UniProtKB/Swiss-Prot annotation:
EC id: 2.5.1.78
Identification of the protein by name: 6,7-dimethyl-8-ribityllumazine synthase
Catalytic residues in the record: H91
Gene: ribH
Pfam hit, one: DMRL_synthase
Pathway note: Cofactor biosynthesis; riboflavin biosynthesis; riboflavin from 2-hydroxy-3-oxobutyl phosphate and 5-amino-6-(D-ribitylamino)uracil: step 1/2
Amino acid sequence: MTVKVVEGDFLQGASAKYAIVVGRFNSFVVESLLEGALDALRRHGVAESQITVYRAPGAFEIPLLAQQVAVRTKPDAVIALGAVIRGGTPHFEYVAGECAKGLGQVSLQSGIPVAFGVLTVDSIEQAIERSGTKAGNKGAEAALSALEMVGLLQQVGE
């Protein structure tokens, strides 16, 4: 007897429709995340006509916009991008926690994969490193996660 293993790949998601929800706050970092995500999708055969970018004011607003996009436009996946940088107040914990929790709820309630590309970092330097320099581009990684999940969900139940 052989165990069946189901895994996603990056090819099955090429014909899918993607929504990218981007927080504008900390735009100097977020724009690099967006470019990374768009580049990753294009490199894997996703046409620009299959991608729509929605801009939220900041990370706290991303979950609601992602939820409405999921419900109203029914993309195959949502890619959430933003940057929350720790400061001297508890604001970071509130925004980062609610954003992560909200996006998880959107995914579970809608049945649409939501890839988490929202940086939650301690410093501007860490944000820059994770948006295309030393630590790669987390926007590109989120796009690859979305591609893989689309392919994986297509196989569930086959």
